[in-house]
Every structure is written in structure tokens, then in C-alpha cells.
Amino acid sequence: MRKLTIIGGGFAGLTAALTAAEAGTEVTVHEAHRTLGGRARTADGPYRTNEGPHALYSGGPHWTWLKQRGLLPALAALPPAEAVRFRVHRDGALRRTPPLGLFRQARRTAEEAPVDLDFHTWATGLAGERTARVAAAYSGVALFHHDPGSLSARFVQERLHRATCLPPEAHYPRGGWGELIERMATRARELGVRIETSSRVDALPLGGGPVIVATALPAAARLLGDPSLTWESGRTVLFDLALRTRKGDPFVISDLDAPGWIERYTAQDPSLAPAGQQLLQAQLPIGPDASKADGVAHAERLLDLGFPGWRERTVWRRESVSQGRTGAVDRPGTTWRDRPAVDRGDGVYLVGDGVAAPGVLAEVSFTSAVEAVSLALRADLPRHRLDLKRA
């Protein structure tokens, strides 16, 4: 039987494991941590947090793939009464509706935007500087970057367009992303995949067939001894907060003065926190010279405006900095094709959200994982033809 080793048991690693196992491959997954999921882990109670604000977009190929296999978990529905509590922060105040120019800019597709020009310059030429700033700030929800306007116009526009489309693409697994990971892991085991947790791999295994490295780029660079495995990513403060419930709190605050996003996840999924409490997760991008305190102060200013008495209502909070863990960002003149290649040669393949694969957020991990399995099995067995029509 064909053999494949996968290092990393996050969303990308499990996607690769399932794809290979469906093709009749003997798969072993090594996960260094005690639990699977990587950045898709959900904390155990009482506060079932993800690693920062997370959503599962329905417009990418991963959605169809998961749905066809019955792997999509139950999804949390947002009540209409909560949906109308979406707020934007603009010119120092909270408002119910974003400026019309944001929607006009967001309607443009990624293909209309240039690769070689930064987003701010391109959008300013079309809609004026004010709209360009607002649109760049809003796109931060899918970028986790402090200055989206400096990035490639096509890269930013794709995310802006996807993040604002109607009906919304963003969906929320009930109970957190960990529910999706658990379903994927269960199916993988049913297909015969051997999953070894607390199994740290410090050197590439030899003689066991192709190897797929499904780790963050810094870990992959150390494992492969290749310092060139780098690509720019965001740097953001993650701010988690549990409050005693108060009727009328916003569902979302999107900062249009500077990239920042606060979301009350219990609005659609009360199971994420104990009864009588609300769980908020926020991300506040910070520049290379800014500190965690700067991001926390940003969050607190927004909370002061939107969540009256939040300090007195706080029952739990947590803050951290996420650096290089939020997916690739592309500078002007570059696209996803310029990122580290999936095929590293000699039967080694690299997958994840920082590699050369298309898509938004988790879609990059998915697409690279399917591509890596296709390449690995094609190279390992020239006569083998992997049917990826369902992927």
C-alpha cells in the first residue's frame, strides 16, 4: 500500500490526510501538541474561544468539499435581532451603517484590481482617499494587518469583496472550530489514518514515502533546514473577554478609522460561555514597532464606546500577540504564486496558509493540501491517477 507521512495535524494536515486516505493511501499524521487543530483549536470550557476571531467562508472550494463528505458541523444561526446590532466606528463615534462608498468599492471583484499597485493608491484613484482608507480598514477583518492599504490592490480587494458580499459568506461552527476538526479527525480514523499526538518530529522521516509538512512556515523552515521559507504575515493583538450579559450590546464593532474588529460570539452561539455571560473575541492589528499594550488600548477604546460598564461586567479576559500566524499577505508586485512553493523536491511538500496556493484565509490551507496530495501520489506512483473532481 502507498504510504504518506504528514507532519502537522491542523486543518491543512487533516485535509491532506483525508484526501490521501480516500485515494487508498496509508497515512500517518504526527501532531506535536496533545490536541489536533493547530490554529483551528477551540479551547475547552467554560469559554470556548478560538485563536482570535474565526469564521468559515462558504464561497471557497473547501466548503463544497466538507459538505459533500458530511463534515460540516452544525452552524450557529445569527438571530435577526442580533444582526442589526452591527456597528462601525468612524470619525471617533459608533454608527449603524458604513459609508456608501465602502459598498461601492467592495462590489468590485479582485480581477478588476491591479497586482502591481498598492490598494490605497488604486482605491483613492477610483473613489477618493476617504473611501480608500475606510475600505482598507474594513478589509482588516480578513487580513490581520495594521496597514492593508500598503498591500497589493488585488490581494486586498479579493478579501474586501468576499467579506462584504450578501448573503454573508461567514459561518460559525456551533461550539467553535474544534467541532469541525473533531469531525475531520474522526473521519480520518475511520479511513484508517493513524494519528499520533504529542509526536514531535525533528527530522524528516526517511524511506516511508512522500512527506507533507503541514506546519507554520517558521517550523517548516527549521525542519527542512531552509531559511528561505518565509513570507510576510500580519501582527495583531488577540483580545478575549467574557462579560455579564447586558441587553443591547453590539454584535460587531468594525473600526473604520484603523483596522480593528470586536465580535460578540455568543450572539449566534450562546454555548460558548456560561449562562448569563457573553464571549467577545477581538483582533487589533499592530505595526512592527507597536506593543501589545497599544492593541489592548485600541480594544478598550472601542469597548468604552459600545459596551457600557464593560469593566464592571468583566468576569474573564485574556490578551496575546499573534505574529506570523494569520496567513500570508501579498505586497504590490506579488501574488500567491510568489510564496514558498508546495513542491519542495525529493518527495517533500509544504502546505498551509502561507504557501503558494489561491484562496482566502483557510482556503489557502485547503487548496495547498489537496495540491500536495495530488503531486505526492502522482510522483510516487506514475500510474496512479488521483480523482480530485470532488475537491
What feature does the model see in each segment?
Residues E82, V88-L94, P98-H161, L166-Y172:
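Rossmann-like flavin
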Residues R2-V29, V373:
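N-terminal Rossmann-like FAD-binding beta1-loop-alpha1 element of flavoenzymes
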Residues Y265, S271-A391:
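Conserved flavin/dinucleotide-binding core of flavoenzymes
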